[in-house]
From Swiss-Prot:
Organism: Hypocrea atroviridis (strain ATCC 20476 / IMI 206040) (Trichoderma atroviride)
Enzyme nomenclature, EC number: 2.1.1.-
Keywords: Methyltransferase, Nucleus, S-adenosyl-L-methionine, Sporulation, Transcription, Transcription regulation, Transferase, Virulence
Annotated Pfam families: Methyltransf_23
Name of the protein: Secondary metabolism regulator LAE1
GO BP terms in the entry: methylation; sporulation resulting in formation of a cellular spore
Function text: Methyltransferase that performs automethylation. No other methyl-accepting substrate has been identified yet. Component of the velvet transcription factor complex that acts as a global regulator for secondary metabolite gene expression. Controls the expression of the gamma-pentyl-pyrone gene clusters. Required for the expression of cellulase. Regulates asexual sporulation (conidiation) by environmental stimuli such as light and/or mechanical injury. Required for oxidative stress tolerance. Also plays a role in defense and parasitism on other fungi.
Amino acid sequence: MSSRNAPSGCVAPSPATAAPPSPTNLRLTVGQSGSESANEPGGEPEERILQDGFWEYGRFYGNWKKGKYNFPIDKEETSRLDILHKYFIVETEDRVTSVPLDKEGSPKIMDLGTGTGIWAFHVVEGYIPNAQIMAVDLNQIQPALIPRGVTTKQFDLEEPSWEPLLRDCDLIHLRLLYGSIRDDLWADTYRKIFEHLAPGGYVEHLEIDWTPQWDGEDHPTHSAIREWSQQFHRAMHRYRRSVKVSSEDTKRMMEAAGFTEFKETKIRCYLNPWSTDRHQREAARWFNLALGLGLEAMSLMPMIDMLHMKQEDVVDLCKRVKAETCVLRYHAYFTLHTWTAKKPASPPQ
């Protein structure tokens, strides 16, 4: 079915790409003694390593370092994170990183905020098979079986010391960590990244600017997408874990940490598959799917706890956003920013 005649305006990804990336096949059903299942009572067991947590607003949240990560870690969310990774891979035409790495060698890599670990798995399974990767996250939501070459580490990146983490890395990769790091700790985070890189190593940081833009003049006067974005930004600002994107601030902090060769690229993340371009349309299908599945996860705790919105009002806002993203004449997009910088091969003279 083409995007032009889809009744709702939203189209599922094509059958050729609908299967999730191969790392998801590594999951197996496990349980940990004394830990709650991350499924509703009576449901199927979770196919991930499980950690203690709590139910709130109908979703399951992590207990470790409670209050630092205000989004769910349940099966719905981990599946959504894998789908979002698929979007990145489709959008970049199967490029897992934009920095030069030795594909025939054994580069050392850290993936900070790894989530389900799918980016790290993709690197060793299809890009650099001999890479050594430490996949770091606050939550243990990675599969119980992981590819050779990858180790997972539960760690709080806001800790003063990163002594337990991998050193002399060729690449340190971050993706969508805004909202998880306190605003006043980003400069120190870049400094620690610099310290854990080998001379000549790279940092690569990807973030989505959740402020909507539109191609052309056709967009709703009272846009649910714009309303959601404003509320989401307000809530995260009150946590002091802002999701506001500032390339100037990022460049300044990276250079203050010692990085050189700062580069930025921007990609438009279209919210629906309106385009006649096949690649752009396919990428938009995946982004539409990931966004639709993730709106409540991103919104419930921040908007209820920080803005004192009622749960039913948050759910209604998310429904209105999903409906608006399925109107093909509205060419809305968010912006994906990728920042890279290099640790000099030798100290400045």
